[in-house]
Amino acid sequence: MTQVVVGQNENIESALRRFKRQVSKAGIFADIKRRRHFETPIEKRKRKAVARRKKRFR
C-alpha cells in the first residue's frame, strides 16, 4: 500500500505529487485498468509475450 507522510511545513500539492509518483512507480493504475474487464487466457498470453519482447529489447 502506498503511503505519503505530509510534513508540517510541506504543502498539500507537493505531497500529492509524491503520492502520484509512488502510485505510478508501483503500477497500481495499470493493474486497475487491466483488471477492469475479464482477460481471457489468450489475451493474457499475448500481453505477457509483448512484455517479454519489450524487456528483451531494453
Curated annotation (Swiss-Prot):
Arranged from A to Z, the UniProt key words for this protein are:
Ribonucleoprotein, Ribosomal protein
Presence of keyword Ribonucleoprotein: yes
**GO MF annotation, one:** structural constituent of ribosome
GO biological process terms, semicolon-separated: translation
Give me the Gene Ontology terms describing cellular component: ribonucleoprotein complex; ribosome
The record's listing under Pfam families reads:
Ribosomal_S21 (PF01165)
Q: Which residues cross the membrane?
A: none
Entry's family note: Belongs to the bacterial ribosomal protein bS21 family.
Q: Which PANTHER family match?
A: MITOCHONDRIAL 28S RIBOSOMAL PROTEIN S21, SMALL RIBOSOMAL SUBUNIT PROTEIN BS21M
* Protein name from the UniProt record: Small ribosomal subunit protein bS21
Q: Which organism is it from?
A: Picosynechococcus sp. (strain ATCC 27264 / PCC 7002 / PR-6) (Agmenellum quadruplicatum)
Which gene codes for it? rpsU
